[in-house]
Amino acid sequence: MLETPKVLLKNLQDCKIHFIGIGGIGISGLAKYLKAQGATISGSDIAISPSVKYLKALGVEINIPHDPKAIKNQDAIIHSAIIKEDNTEIQRAKELKIPILSRKDALYSILKDKRVFSVCGAHGKSSITAMLSAIFPFFGAIIGAHSKEFDSNVRESANDSLVFEADESDSSFLFSNPYAAIVPNTEPEHLEHYDHNLERFFFAYEYFLDHAQKRVIYKEDPFLKNYSKDAIVLEKKDIRNIQYILKDGEPHTSFELKDLGAFLVWGLGEHNATNASLAILSALDELDLEEIRNNLLNFKGIKKRFDILQKNALILIDDYAHHPTEISATLKSARIYANLLNTQEKIVVIWQAHKYSRLMDNLEEFKKCFLEHCDRLIILPVYSASEVKRDIDLKAHFKHYNPTFIDRVRKKGDFLELLVNDNVVETIQKGFVIGFGAGDITYQLRGEM
């Protein structure tokens, strides 16, 4: 059983809450949601980010960098998972005896009275959550990425129902109070949080599913295929006649689901049809089928997930994929998109590995995932995400790709410049380029740094 957090957020209309690490996508989502609920929000982070800029524009006071003077008379402090005990603001809050909550403890207070459609899995959870938010336009939403439908990762609603992207990386999904638990896959990752114990890892997923009134699962997953309790089940054979089209110049997937007829959804790839199918099945007892079919058309994709930044002489796509399975699936989508555009350009990949631990844990899979649809591989330095640097010979491990190694990429108008030691070594003016990574590559590709 989970231990109920001792500190609960109450009376949000009068509550003053300070967020440490407010620029992160998960923490910023909670900050936006609680502000909309009536709380007074402040925060801090180590650097300016788009989320910080957005919150500042809403009138939120944010300190860059962390500053103990920012801790005054708040009712509670909420911090991201990467914030350590020796953080100066944490120490000041302890001195003032202000209650301190981790993000996952705060979730309990925020979600405990909500009817939550909670989506969790190694891959696809952001897309499924955003698809559900399109299907349920009157529900609130907290997503781990920006939905292009409403240009935010949060949508406030007076409705008690909420679609929520849950996080398995720190087991916070167990605090999400799922009315409906939607799980597309359970591929092991973030095992350091589970003491590298697979039994403990899968038990967490089982607990998550067991405590939901409604469960929607993809039975092709090795763990989920053996789940024995009642669940709405999706299998690969349930999805038929997958086709890819350009609709108003935008990539779409059409498919037939079970005996429910045909659906159309933004995006490309079999995984896209699978994600949409899980969202549809989650909504069947909530809405009329035709309303689901029509509302799904409002899904316009999410930022950093096959995010088409430009499509002129240089086709440029930004994608958050940072795991070999995700990269492989997205490269297939890139090939489909290139075919739809009738371009003969080779697919150039710019890859920024995210975290040394993930790179080392999945090294053999990373070495294979670019084989099928990558014509040229360009490799950026590893984005450490505050991890200690490890020695790894990327040139030796990836020599079969004959890769190009650079320090950074810079957007210059409609072109991309590749830099080594601050010198431009190449300019890409035309072609098909897709960037992969969960670090700052997204800002490099967008010319935001």
UniProtKB/Swiss-Prot annotation:
One of its GO terms (molecular function) is ATP binding. It comes from the Bacteria. It holds the Pfam family Mur_ligase_C. Disulfide bonds: none annotated. One of its GO terms (biological process) is cell wall organization. It is found in: Cytoplasm. The keyword Cell wall biogenesis/degradation applies. It catalyses: UDP-N-acetyl-alpha-D-muramate + L-alanine + ATP = UDP-N-acetyl-alpha-D-muramoyl-L-alanine + ADP + phosphate + H(+). Its main location: cytoplasm. GO terms for cellular component: cytoplasm. Its EC number is 6.3.2.8. Pathway: Cell wall biogenesis; peptidoglycan biosynthesis. ATP binds at residues 121-127. Keywords: ATP-binding, Cell cycle, Cell division, Cell shape, Cell wall biogenesis/degradation, Cytoplasm, Ligase, Nucleotide-binding, Peptidoglycan synthesis. PANTHER family: UDP-N-ACETYLMURAMATE--L-ALANINE LIGASE, UDP-N-ACETYLMURAMATE--L-ALANINE LIGASE-RELATED. Cell wall formation. NCBIfam families: murC. This is UDP-N-acetylmuramate--L-alanine ligase. It comes from Helicobacter pylori (strain Shi470).
